[in-house]
Amino acid sequence: MAATLRELRGRIRSAGSIKKITKAQELIATSRIAKAQARVEAARPYSTEITSMLTELASASALDHPLLVARENPRRAAVLVVSSDRGLCGAYNANVLRQSEELFALLREEGKEPVVYTVGRKAQGYFNFRQREVTESWSGFSERPTYENAKEIADTLVASFMSGADDEGDDAGADGVLGVDELHIVFTEFRSMLSQSAAARRIAPMVVEYVGDEQPEDGPQTLFSFEPDPETLFDALLPRYVATRVYAALLEAAASESASRRRAMKSATDNADDLIKALKLSANRERQAQITQEISEIVGGANALADSR
């Protein structure tokens, strides 16, 4: 009985230590969510405007650019998988990796070979453990991404995409580099503190809705005059467009990671509280039984002495 009581008290101390860790992680994640959410909201207008501007440029001048035109018989598709560097964030990484596997299966059904790029140590470890090739990976900034991080990733993806413009099947073409024909990104969309979901988006070829001569119902159509010419503007803005899309995805993923970690740590803290209460109740019962037994032994001994007289 004494051994059982010592074991229960040891488990109570262990649960208390774990509770301190999970509570600290919960508080840290809570403090980061507001900042991450503010960064997401601040980046959205720029992302929306640059996409709108590129759409207007392409629609107004009917540009024929590699990032706009879908290639015939695409064979390879780059997929950027955005995960976290650390764990303790619930099903955050599992959902992203499941979404990426679904995208891989879809691409293979279409006859396209997925070319994997990763952000975060968790995705890199996932593919390395399964001995699957990762073309390039980035880590160390999943919770606090910067535009410089996004630009580095975007430059790599755009270079691979542009290298694929002259490829013919498995032939690397004139540049000798086997590139890709599509760019995709898998990340976690941040909708609210309580709602985040894994999503897959195609970055390139860019989808452009061409506007005809019809006037919109709610007013006249806006006419734009571009200086310099649309082609020059388009070449200058396209790299920024890809970097902006990647940056927006990194920011949403960072906010989602913090929200998921806060939720997971709060659940772990609550479970630790419940476990400690249950263990204390069991310990109190054991102690009560031990005291009752000791009293019974004392009374029994006293009665035995009285009878012997």
From Swiss-Prot:
Protein's UniProt keywords contain Cell membrane: yes
GO molecular function terms noted in the UniProt entry: ATP binding; proton-transporting ATP synthase activity, rotational mechanism
One GO cellular component term: proton-transporting ATP synthase complex
Entry keyword DNA-binding: no
Annotated CDD domains: F1-ATPase_gamma (cd12151)
InterPro entries noted in UniProt: ATP_synth_F1_ATPase_gsu, ATP_synth_F1_gsu, ATP_synth_F1_gsu_CS
Membrane disposition: Peripheral membrane protein
Main location as per UniProt: membrane
Pfam families: ATP-synt
Segments forming a coiled coil: none
Keywords attached to this entry: ATP synthesis, Cell membrane, CF(1), Hydrogen ion transport, Ion transport, Membrane, Transport
Subunit structure: F-type ATPases have 2 components, CF(1) - the catalytic core - and CF(0) - the membrane proton channel. CF(1) has five subunits: alpha(3), beta(3), gamma(1), delta(1), epsilon(1). CF(0) has three main subunits: a, b and c.
PANTHER family: ATP SYNTHASE GAMMA CHAIN, ATP SYNTHASE SUBUNIT GAMMA, MITOCHONDRIAL
Function recorded in the entry: Produces ATP from ADP in the presence of a proton gradient across the membrane. The gamma chain is believed to be important in regulating ATPase activity and the flow of protons through the CF(0) complex.
UniProt xrefs under NCBIfam families: ATPsyn_F1gamma (TIGR01146), PRK05621.1-2 (NF004145)
Record-stated family: Belongs to the ATPase gamma chain family.
Stored HAMAP family: ATP_synth_gamma_bact
Protein's name in the database: ATP synthase gamma chain
